[in-house]
Amino acid sequence: KVHFEFNDRGRGPKLDSSYTLDAKGLPVTIALKGVDYLKASVDETFTRSADAMTWKNAAEDEKRALVGPAFFLTLNPVPEEDALLARALLNAPEQQLDLVPAGRASIRKLASMSVSGKAGTREVDLYAISGLTLMPYLIWLDRDQRFFAGYSSWSCLIREGFEEAIPAIEKR
């Protein structure tokens, strides 16, 4: 279960999500509720059975035959979903997976470093996930492959207690 929210001058998401994963780290069930960045209602569900996948969100109400390992991407993801995808990719053959509703993603490790903050010192790894957008998506994971940080030109999410590490993460 994950709760995610931020306030950007009165805007920003407020989302509660729960994930059930199989042994390979692929979603079996997802439930996501709350509001998106513009405060529109969010109510997403995903279920994978032995032979089919079904999902419903503001844009889709779909059912498809299950044709192999695949990772479902929600319409309004919380940052933890990126870490779940990264872990699933790291455990997948050739570190690649099909995506649902469409696409294929791959992952590669770019760098490793040690970071320090009020919460201590951690060894973290920078990964690039390709196939989600035109440019690879960058994500930092700790050595337990848990979300550590995500950085872009307009925002940074980092594990609490490691805010002092943002400049080092930014330089990578």
Predicted ranges, named:
Residues Y37-I129, D144, F148-Y151, C156-E160, ...:
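Solvent-exposed helix/loop surface patches that form functional interfaces
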